[in-house]
Structure formats: C-alpha cells, structure tokens
Amino acid sequence: MNTFGQLFRLSSFGESHGRGIGGVLDGCPPGLTVDLELIRKELSRRRPGQSALSTNRNEADEVELISGIFEGKTTGAPIAFLVRNTDMRSQDYDYLKGIFRPSHADYTYHSKYGIRDHRGGGRSSARETIARVVAGAFAKMLLNTMNISIEAFTSQIGPIALEQQDSTLFSSELAAENPLHCPDREKAEAMMALIARVKEEQDSIGGVVSCVVRGLPVGWGEPVFGKLHARLASAILSIPACKGFEYGSGFDVSQKGSQQNDAFYFDGERINTRSNHSGGIQGGISNGQPVYFRAAFKPIASIRIPQETVDKEGAAVKIQIQGRHDPCALPRVLPVVEAMAALVLADACLMAKSKERIV
C-alpha cells in the first residue's frame, strides 16, 4: 500500500531516480496556517549531502505545493506536493539490473512484481521518505496548535549508547549542539568518530532513535485493533531499515509488577502518575503522560566491501556496490521518525474529535 492513515491520510509516489517524490495529503483541516519555514526546516534535516555523516548526493529538496492552500491557509481540499530529483547518477546502477544486492529489496520486489526499477532502489529507496517528511510537517502544524511537541534524538550508534535510558529526561539544548542530535557531548563525539571510521572502511553501522511526545491529552487512540502504540509501531516500522520498536519500558522485563506499575495520584489539578513505565499509553489510549519510544535501524545495506550474491538466473556473482550511500541511517532518519509519529497523532486527533461525547 502507498497510503497511510484513516482520516489524516497520506498517499505518496515517486522513485529514487524518477522525476521526483511527492504525495497527496487528504483530511487536513481547513484554516490551518501553513508554515513554509517549518516544511523547509524538516526537509533540510532529512536532505542528503549536509554533513560528513551522510551521502554526498546533493539535492536541494525544494517542495512545490500544488493544491489545497489559499492565501497561506489550508482549504480542507487535498494538499498535493512534489519534490523534484535533480542529482541522479543512474549509470552507477546499470551493472545491477539483473543482480540482487544482499539485504536489499531487489529480490523481493522482483519476485512479487516481475519488474523492478534498479536505479538507486527505485520505490524501495529511503528517498521515498521525503513525502513522509512534508506530510509530517503539516501534521506538526496541526499538533502545534495544541502545544503538542515531538522530538527524536540519537541514543545509540553501534555499541555506543546513552547510559540514561529515560527518554523524557534528555536535554534538547545539548542535542542541538551536534549533527547527530545526541544529548550527550562525550557520547556524540564517540558516535561521530565511529561513523567516520566505518565510512572510511566502506562499511555501515546501525543505531537507535529515541523519540518523546509531550502535551498529548488523555483519550487519543482506539481500543483493541487501533491502539495508539500499535499504530505508532506500524508507522515507525514502515520506515526503510527500521528493524525494531519498543515503547515505555518495552523489553525491560527484569522488574516485577510492583516495580513497573504506574501509581496514580491527584496533583491538585488532574490525575497524574508517579512513574511512566507505560510510556504514556494504557489500554492503547493516551493517559496524558509523555509518550516515548525507541526504534532500531539496521546498518545500511549498501556498502562498498565486495559481497557474494546471485543474479536473476541464479548464477553466483561477486559485487562491489557503487553509488552514493549513507554510512548510517542516523541522523537523517530523525525527522522521518518524527514525521511518522506526527502523522499517527494527527490521525488520532481527528478520530478522537469525531468521537467526542455529546451528552
């Protein structure tokens, strides 16, 4: 499927070496002031060629807003947009036309469709995430009107991880000091050095993104099959190279129930919890506490080290991947994680509004 969401719905299109990447966003409420600077900022964070930590493919990534906006505000009509591709080197991929790259989508796409665009991965390329980031910026505009914030940061690269695992305690100011958006100066330096070394070795490395959502009201999310954490997991795991997701205390099963349970108390204004092991979600519905989750991204599959594989006839071949590739999904994936979280929450917002009690 190329469409995500129920009421706040994105349909995306485009390939890595096609004419462009774009989308149609349907369900965005009318009257929302369009923040063009926010869209540019989010695209810039995702844009290739911005630092030594990323690919040197150089794209301007300027968005054309085609419909759904009048006099600086959304009209309620579908918002169509396009970001044109300008720096493609398709010839770098000609030798791969009949070869399946290890751990890429080449084999599965070919097996499923009988045809595939071999240029830069085609539709399976992470360049597709441009559409998510643009749509996510509109979702953020909606959430900003309710003082809801979303912030992702780097919490691990390879074996180097933050010691503080409580995502809600990190410093935005410290994170803003480095390209990785890591809230620990020492760890950030070590992480960047590791990525640089891996890049020099023509290899790649994986990492973990932590994300915090603040300001959510109580009551967003649906019971049973539409649980908020399940929809977040679906959204985040749809991002290329994402291999794992946990929210709240997640896989930390060493504690007993008496330690994990979040005790309720009344703070004089509203019901609160003394801890937040639940990650801001209980029964699939937001409880008013910060929502936090972590997502693991595998090492980028495109590496220049020689590898063994087969062609579409099954003959064994040895390849050395050319082209321009990131040594690590982080930090460029951070705005994509935020965008997907924003799309889920904007959709949850509209669903909650549609079910507000009238008696």
Q: Language-model segments: which ranges?
A:
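N-terminal, positively charged regions that mediate nucleic acid binding
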Residues: 1-57
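Internal helix-turn-beta structural module
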Residues: 9, 300-359
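A short glycine/serine-rich beta->alpha loop
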Residues: 9-14, 117-128, 218-220, 276-281, ...
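Glycine-rich anion/phosphate-binding loop at the beta-strand->alpha-helix junction
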Residues: 13-19, 202-205, 209-316
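Alpha-helical support elements that line or immediately flank enzyme active sites
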Residues: 19-31, 127-148, 226-234, 289-291, ...
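Glycine-rich, N-terminal phosphate-binding loop and its surrounding beta-alpha-beta segment
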Residues: 43-102, 106
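Short acidic, glycine/tyrosine-flanked loop/strand segments centered on an H-E-D-like triad
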Residues: 97-122, 307-325
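Glycine-rich, mobile lid/loop segments that gate access to catalytic sites or pores
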Residues: 112-224
